[in-house]
Amino acid sequence: MNEALVIKKSTALTEELLGVLLALEEKVFPSPLSREALRARLGDRKGLVILVAWHGDTPCGYKVGFEDSPEVFYSWVGGVAPQYRRLGIARKLLDEQHRVVKSMGFAYVRTSTKNKYREMLLLNIKAGFDVVGVQKKLKEVEQGILLEKAL
């Protein structure tokens, strides 16, 4: 990566930003979220924070979350495009998210992941998250691992 990485923050879901998130979803996940699913989940969220990492004109990673309660920010989804992995981008997005939400007055960040996303689980633990529980969703075989960090 010769060009500097730039992380841009947004607190509103515009159509342009939705397009960027969709493109990243398709690169990051085998079953990406749809435009409708993203819009439904994020459209009117209180405390919405969307971070996109850019390498030049190319979006290469993202991290999205919102207010879960007045003290708790929920880090909902994020990822890094495969060709940009192992360059520290996920950690930079995580650190920036925590800096931003702490400045917004949140005391905790909460997230969840699955056992199959080992790199994300390890990143969160290395960043100071504690495992606080597991949850079983009816339509999913695998349990979710709940994590929380005091800011």
Where do the model's predicted regions map?
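Conserved catalytic-core motifs of GNAT/GCN5-like acyltransferases
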Residues: 110-114, 125-146
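Conserved acetyl-CoA-binding loop-helix of GNAT-fold acetyltransferases
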Residues: 80, 86-99, 126
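Short, well-ordered beta-strand micro-motif
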Residues: 52-54, 146-150
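Acetyl-CoA-dependent GNAT
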Residues: 11-76, 81, 137
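Conserved short alpha-helix immediately C-terminal to the canonical SAM/SAH-binding motif I
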Residues: 93, 117-120
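Polar/charged side chains located within well-ordered beta-strands of beta-rich proteins
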Residues: 25, 63, 75, 94-97, ...
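Conserved N-terminal entry element of GNAT/NAT acetyltransferase domains
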Residues: 1-16, 149-151
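Conserved GNAT acetyl-CoA-binding A-motif
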Residues: 101-113
